Regions:
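Short linear sequence motif anchored by a di-proline
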Residues: 1-100
């Protein structure tokens, strides 16, 4: 899985900064209990045409991606609940969440 995001580089004096953000979509009911507020834009990394289009810096028309901004799961995911950000050990069974 790849996440759809944006980045921008800034030059401030001698320092170059890069900022990033992950694009979010409306929540998906299949992710209730995991992430209820929004769904990150998930791109199917095996769809090489989509990935190439996403990474093409000459493509500036965001309408080409409107169909992806629905919150629909475009790819199946596997999720394992963990104890916390500092303890990545599993605290439950792994779930298979099938794409829409």
């Amino acid at each position: 899985m790849a996440l759809g995001g944006l980045y921008k580089r800034y030059q401030i004096g001698e320092q170059q900064l890069t900022t990033t953000s992950v694009i979010t979509c409306p929540p998906n009911r299949k992710l209730d209990g995991i992430h209820e507020k929004s769904t990150p834009l998930m791109l199917d990394w095996q769809d090489q045409d989509l990935i190439n289009m996403w990474l093409d810096p000459s493509l500036t028309d965001s309408e080409a991606f409107r169909h992806l901004l629905t919150g629909e799961l475009m790819t199946s995911i596997t999720a394992t609940p963990i104890k916390g950000a500092r303890d990545l050990s599993a605290r439950g069974e792994t779930l298979e969440i099938v794409k829409d």
